[in-house]
Amino acid sequence: MDSLTFTPGRAFLSSNSLAPPWTAVFEDEGPAGYFYACDRSQETQEHSIMDAMLIYNRTSLADPAQERLASIQWSRDGQQCVLYLDGSAQAFIDFAAHLSFCRTNFPNYIQEQGDTWRKHSHAWDDAALQHFEADLYA
């Protein structure tokens, strides 16, 4: 598990899967925190981002000055990962199934022809998270 202690407004945590080419990135550049599903085999950084999810808007946090802990936990096969903030799951990426979801269910896009990643919904899925966590500790 890769972790970072940070104060909202400036954070960067990148975590590589043991199963290349997958990478998960948590980033907060000021107004908001995002979680990215990335494919390192792509030629440009722009093309490497498979999906992006809003984790929080800084102004909506109860105490934006409070120090927090971000952690990225990978599944044993390296095909899935979860972003935890202060121990609470906030986002899930399944690289094999090409889907992601988060607590904010944002952003959602109209699915376009040729899209290989599900982007029309980021709705939270408790069952998938429970399965992920059960497999970790089995």
Segments the model singles out, each with a brief description of its role:
Residues M1-L4, Y34-D63, A91-D115, D125-A138:
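Surface-exposed loop/turn elements that mediate protein-protein interactions on large endomembrane-trafficking
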Residues S3-P20, F26-G30, I72-G78, W117-A138:
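Blade-terminus and WD-like Trp-Asp/Gly-His loop motifs, strongest in beta-propeller folds
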Residues S60-R76:
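Short linear interaction motifs
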Residues V25-E29, C38-R40, Y84-G87:
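Beta-strand C-termini and the immediately following turn/loop, strongest in propeller blades
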Residues R10-F12, I49, Y56, R68:
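Amphipathic, alpha-helical segments enriched in basic
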